[in-house]
């Protein structure tokens, strides 16, 4: 686990891309194992949706559509952030 200061240093040194006003949804950093072994910021999809609902007053459906089109559908270079979608591990009753 890394602390906030180390995270900020890595972002600065590696010139990692961040989504504007979405810091609350950051869950970490990952390394893409391609020819560059590039580090990228990782966001939690559910937290992104909640972020837009809280900050912009969107409904759940509006925020889902916004994240799907404007975040998941965007490419902003080699350090485009990854979006983590968690697996629901709850067992049915």
Description of each model-found segment:
Residues 2-93:
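C-terminal alpha-helical interaction appendages
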């Amino acid at each position: 686990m890394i602390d906030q200061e180390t995270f900020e240093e890595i972002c600065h040194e590696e010139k990692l891309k961040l989504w504007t006003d979405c810091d609350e949804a950051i869950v970490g950093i990952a390394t893409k194992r391609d020819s560059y072994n590039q580090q990228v910021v990782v966001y939690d999809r559910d937290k992104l949706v909640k972020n837009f609902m809280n900050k912009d007053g969107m409904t759940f459906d509006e925020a889902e559509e916004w994240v799907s089109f404007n975040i998941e559908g965007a490419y902003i270079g080699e350090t485009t952030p990854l979006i983590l979608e968690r697996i629901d591990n709850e067992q049915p009753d």
